[in-house]
Amino acid sequence: MFVIQDGVGDRPVPALGGKTPLEAANTPHMDSLIQEGSAGLMDVIGPGITVGTDTGHLALFDQEFKNNYYRRGPMEAVGVGIFLNSGEVALRCNFATVDSDFNILDRRAGRIRDEAKALAYSLDGLDIAEGVNVVFRSATEHRAVLVLKGDKLSEDISDSDPGDGSAEHKVLEVNPQSDHSHARRTADLVNRFIQYAHLILQEHPV
């Protein structure tokens, strides 16, 4: 059995005497597993390189992942039963709590669970542009998948999530990461989806 404790490391907390939550926690079952097996530290990519969930898992299971790298969106899409066709773009999403200025209050919306399905249903099929079909599905807890179907789409766009460790706490504008018109179009579509989704979800009874 190969146990991956993704994200469990955390950071030291002053209220815990400078310990991380894991160091301060009572973990008898984890301790037992380690005593019966083996544990250690490793640099998944290289010394000093912080990796995300997708990169870390791919590196652990596929030594050739640098040549076979798939972004997280397509993997999340398959996880909820959506299989992509050529030219379609899948994005891994979070339900998040924001204020009226798009300042992020909670990147995971309180780790919402069953209610996420109702929220996702209200966004599925959203009309953001002629010739573009929107598929939106809830995944585990606060996670969701956005699939854009249509012509002239590109995966070469930036993220709207500043991330946990960022000094920025506002939803970021999605920008093209290439000069291709398809990337510019896709970035505009995703920004439009975010704006429309905010208008719909802020009035949602959930």
Residue ranges, per PLM feature:
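Short, flexible coil/turn micro-motifs enriched in small/turn-prone residues
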Residues: 2-4, 43, 158
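A contiguous, mid-domain pocket- or channel-lining segment that forms the substrate-recognition surface
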Residues: 72, 76-200
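Beta-strand elements within well-structured catalytic alpha/beta cores of enzymes
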Residues: 1-11, 33, 193-196, 206
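Aromatic-enriched hydrophobic runs in primary sequence
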Residues: 6, 33-36, 137, 189
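Active-site nucleophile/metal-coordination loop of metallo-enzymes that catalyze phosphate/sulfate
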Residues: 9-125
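Beta-sheet entry/capping signal
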Residues: 1, 39, 143-145
